[in-house]
């Protein structure tokens, strides 16, 4: 994991615009929001899925950067006053607090654009063109109205509402789960001619851990402190957002996360020890903060 952290951080530093180039403040905001912070869970999932499939190393670096840039863009916009209005992210002032609201909006836009530039021009030719196009489409869908953006829209519309479990799951399958599923599948697709059956099993794994990730996030928002979280503790409760602990109770939410973890692990039965990083990441997702 440490090697993967070093690889993705080095690649991100390379692909992000130099903060001394014009427009300086925009480039500073982009680098500020991406570098020196974050758990890098999505890039790690790219690398872990690639490891399980013996994928191309260069393609994995590019793809790991792409999913982290999309994630960073989404966090910048989620933190804006018009959305979650948060002051802290990764233990430091949010982008719009460190710079300005206008610069934060532009930084998010620019990170999203850079994502698709990387996938369009920096994936190696060893990956078939059709497969590269499929990866582009996959990330576009995962980040748009049928993915993250759609999930955030549902989230904003659900403030103060009582959602059913099915409605809450649907929201987070889009808001959180879509990018996690794309990260795993795109990592696997960094192998030329990826096996469709194995890809389907990885997608099921990713769907399970995507929901488990959000449940654990909701749990930590209730029980962890601001310093541990790196963002404002209790923010979801303060905004009267629907969460798994609020709907199910804390203990039942923990049990649901563990059931999803077990389901995720079972979906990896046909994979050998090269899938152990995926198994470890699933465990990390449900145990982090404990």
Residue ranges, per PLM feature:
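Generic C-terminal helix-cap and adjacent flexible tail
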Residues: 273, 287-290
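Mg2+-dependent prenyl diphosphate-binding active-site environment of isoprenoid biosynthetic enzymes
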Residues: 4-7, 16, 20-267, 276-286
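Double-stranded RNA-binding/processing signature
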Residues: 1
